[in-house]
Amino acid sequence: MNEAGTPINPIAFQLGPLSVHWYGIIIGAGALLGLWMAMRESEKRGLKKDIFIDLVLFAIPIAIICARAYYVLFEWSYYSEHPGEIIKIWKGGIAIHGGLIGAIATGIVFSKVRGISFWKLADIAAPSILLGQAIGRWGNFINQEAHGEAVSRSFLESLHLPDFIINQMYIDGQYYHPTFLYESLWSFAGVVILLLLRRVNLRRGNLFLTYVIWYSIGRYFIEGMRTDSLMLTSQLRIAQVISIVLIVLAIILMIFRRMKGYADKRYADTD
């Protein structure tokens, strides 16, 4: 058993001088599982399954760059003094909202170039994106980041958590709220909901917008528990502001697209 105070080594293994970090392995695993899910669904919706391979070849590196840039921007007071740390993403410090912005922008351009509906691609990808986020939070677990306020061990035990989670939440002599776990479970629940909503045959675009709303609601409340949030002011957490904006924007888009006739097609339509 991993003893309290002895965290899991963030380095999974060495390849000569190269250190392979669990963080990268977990993020990569989430991306691959999400890609597999999207490829399976794309064939059912009249698209070639390799369309998502082409998309992720652009979307993943751009999303990672945007996620890191977003984080660095709001922590510039530190990175301006330590510029060599900017590229060290294996230590953590990538923001999901930044990655989402990069992925959406890439998807819009990609869909225009390929002559495919962006909303069709986004609907198919929505459960995959959320699955990747759910898995990716375990990279934060290994790095002992994205945690909440200090708590007692007895509190963590009252949640019936396995010992390996409780022990990994022991950081510098104190136990912490496993907020990474709360967000991961919220995201896994969202994947199930989105997969069920596929059967309802929603209007095109609404599945993706439902993902945005679901994720943002969970992120808003869980972010309030974290101690390492990016801050806009001393009292205002950036992720909470962005979450509110995304919820409002998604609802407006649902209504606007319906009123203007832009959402007449359904999820299951193959054209």
Curated annotation (Swiss-Prot):
Gene Ontology molecular-function annotations: phosphatidylglycerol-prolipoprotein diacylglyceryl transferase activity
Chief place of localization: membrane
Membrane topology value: Multi-pass membrane protein
Any one annotated GO CC term: plasma membrane
Pathway: Protein modification; lipoprotein biosynthesis (diacylglyceryl transfer)
Subcellular localization(s) per the UniProt record: Cell membrane
Protein keywords: Cell membrane, Membrane, Transferase, Transmembrane, Transmembrane helix
Matches recorded under Pfam families: LGT (PF01790)
Domain of life the protein comes from: Bacteria
Transmembrane stretches, start-end: 18-38, 51-71, 89-109, 115-135, 177-197, 205-225, 236-256
Binding locations of a 1,2-diacyl-sn-glycero-3-phospho-(1'-sn-glycerol): R137
PANTHER family: PHOSPHATIDYLGLYCEROL--PROLIPOPROTEIN DIACYLGLYCERYL TRANSFERASE, PROLIPOPROTEIN DIACYLGLYCERYL TRANSFERASE
Stated family: Belongs to the Lgt family.
Function in brief: Catalyzes the transfer of the diacylglyceryl group from phosphatidylglycerol to the sulfhydryl group of the N-terminal cysteine of a prolipoprotein, the first step in the formation of mature lipoproteins.
Protein name as catalogued: Phosphatidylglycerol--prolipoprotein diacylglyceryl transferase
Protein source organism: Bacillus velezensis (strain DSM 23117 / BGSC 10A6 / LMG 26770 / FZB42) (Bacillus amyloliquefaciens subsp. plantarum)
